Amino acid sequence: MSQRPNPSALIWLLLSALVVGLDQWSKAWVLSSLPEYTPVPVIDGFWNWYRTYNTGAAFSFLSDAGGWQLWFFTALAVGISGLLAFWLSRTARGQWRSALPYALVIGGAIGNVIDRLMHGHVVDFIQWYIGSHTWPSFNIADSAIVGGAIGIAVFGLFDKSDKQQPGTGNLR
């Protein structure tokens, strides 16, 4: 008698789609409503809307590299998203500690890929600062990628469900 396979975590790709949708909706709002390179205060002394563009990666890494970085970061994001989607397909639906961060990274990566392909750069608009110390501008996709990466690291370090139980020789 064959055992029915566990449903995969691919349903979590709906979260990825939600991240992409919110990211693209927010960027459409930014492009239609905010002036370029002009702070619009949200919370004085801490948070502005600030429409800017990034042709590189996090913290504008390689933004002045001459154009090849557009295709490099696009290919990297698509490759990582594909790998994470494959891992989702091999993950049980209830394994949210793996599925949630994978889905967040996929959604964020695809959101920024859409920007790169449509605009040639990523649209950033959230600016946090204290006094004269400003954090680099970012967007919803970036937030999802960072949240997912933190989740992968934290749950990977502290989740013992896949580890061998001491003295039993059996996996949990």
From Swiss-Prot:
Q: Which GO terms describe its molecular function?
A: aspartic-type endopeptidase activity
Q: In which pathway does it act?
A: Protein modification; lipoprotein biosynthesis (signal peptide cleavage)
Organism per entry: Xanthomonas axonopodis pv. citri (strain 306)
- What Pfam families does UniProt report for this protein, alphabetically? Peptidase_A8
Q: What is its EC number?
A: 3.4.23.36
Task: Identify the keywords attached in UniProt to this record, alphabetized.
Answer: Aspartyl protease, Cell inner membrane, Cell membrane, Hydrolase, Membrane, Protease, Transmembrane, Transmembrane helix
Q: What class does this enzyme belong to in the EC scheme?
A: hydrolase
User: What protein name applies here?
Assistant: Lipoprotein signal peptidase
What task does this protein carry out? This protein specifically catalyzes the removal of signal peptides from prolipoproteins.
UniProt catalytic activity: Release of signal peptides from bacterial membrane prolipoproteins. Hydrolyzes -Xaa-Yaa-Zaa-|-(S,diacylglyceryl)Cys-, in which Xaa is hydrophobic (preferably Leu), and Yaa (Ala or Ser) and Zaa (Gly or Ala) have small, neutral side chains
